[in-house]
Amino acid sequence: MSYNHKNVLDTEQFSKSDLDFLIKKIKDMEHLVERHKAFGILTGKLLASLFFEASTRTRLSFEAAMERLGGRVISTVGFQFSSISKGETLYDTMKMVEAYADIAVIRHPVEGSSRIAAGAVKIPVVNAGDGAGQHPTQAILDLYTIISEKGTLDGLSVAFIGDLKYGRTIHSLINLLRHYKVRLYLISPIELALPDSYKKGLEGYPLTLEETTDIKAVWECDVAYVTRIQEERFPDHKEYERLKDLFKINKELILASKKETTILHPLPRVNELSTDVDDLPNAAYFRQARYGVVSRMTLLCLCLGQDF
């Protein structure tokens, strides 16, 4: 099949056949990187890295991906270093970026901002996180990580632990997992439960869903996806302080599981995932970060119409 998505804005845009194609192409890219490390598929192409919200991993992952493909990067980090701080609209900023770059990657604190950005320009736009909305490239690399670690998706039980209300990585990955025969366990405080809009979006798909506040439900799961409590999204800091330490994953909890539960985390972590888990063979979050580069290399090529 061919890839027909110029932009990567949310996970709803991908069908099951799109995902099957992407997983195959990411595997192909992984093999290429193992042999050559870097190559010139995107020589002469320029990526605009527009991060108006804090990021280390995602920004460096995209920039490393472009550099490994032979392309180059121009960047801006934070509102204070951009003309937006002077009152320029995102639309006008994107029109200027279009004059400089062949593709834009944008992170922005306002949900839906990537669609505004894409609507302003003809170059491809990739959403690297829009507020509490979505983070589609993280979801694609997470999906690839699960398949790489477990060999399949169908039949797996996957736990999402922590901030399911504001966690955009969770929102995005759940939208992809709905295409597979999986059992989802949503483990969170009631106050941070998955929004109803996302649960409604799962209706009619082959997965099953269970919500609980019991952290020991992770013992029933093949995969545990742990996230930090999103302090920056809370309107009331006291509420954050009350909830931040309710769910913690440590080695003792994981070793008590009946299954060899693979542990994922989009990072950064605070104190929801103990460092004593790091030396377990099923702690996959650092491998997950490595999969991110080849996943984004693949998406950059496909968005620019460059097959490999």
UniProtKB/Swiss-Prot annotation:
Positions annotated to bind L-aspartate: 86, 168, 228
PROSITE patterns according to UniProt: CARBAMOYLTRANSFERASE
GO molecular function ontology, one term from the record: aspartate carbamoyltransferase activity
Keyword annotations from UniProtKB, A to Z: Pyrimidine biosynthesis, Transferase
EC number(s) from the headed UniProt entry: 2.1.3.2
InterPro entries xref list: Asp/Orn_carbamoyltranf_P-bd, Asp/Orn_carbamoylTrfase, Asp/Orn_carbamoylTrfase_sf, Asp_carbamoyltransf, Asp_carbamoyltransf_Asp/Orn-bd
GO biological process terms held by the UniProt record: 'de novo' pyrimidine nucleobase biosynthetic process; 'de novo' UMP biosynthetic process; amino acid metabolic process
Swiss-Prot/TrEMBL catalytic activity: carbamoyl phosphate + L-aspartate = N-carbamoyl-L-aspartate + phosphate + H(+)
Binding, carbamoyl phosphate: 57-58, 107, 135, 138, 267-268
Pathway note: Pyrimidine metabolism; UMP biosynthesis via de novo pathway; (S)-dihydroorotate from bicarbonate: step 2/3
Primary enzyme class: transferase
Record's function text: Catalyzes the condensation of carbamoyl phosphate and aspartate to form carbamoyl aspartate and inorganic phosphate, the committed step in the de novo pyrimidine nucleotide biosynthesis pathway.
UniProt record similarity statement: Belongs to the aspartate/ornithine carbamoyltransferase superfamily. ATCase family.
Subunit structure, as described in the record: Heterododecamer (2C3:3R2) of six catalytic PyrB chains organized as two trimers (C3), and six regulatory PyrI chains organized as three dimers (R2).
NCBIfam families linked: asp_carb_tr, PRK00856.1
Name assigned to this protein: Aspartate carbamoyltransferase catalytic subunit
Organism of this sequence: Leptospira borgpetersenii serovar Hardjo-bovis (strain JB197)
Classification lineage: Bacteria, Pseudomonadati, Spirochaetota, Spirochaetia, Leptospirales
Gene: pyrB
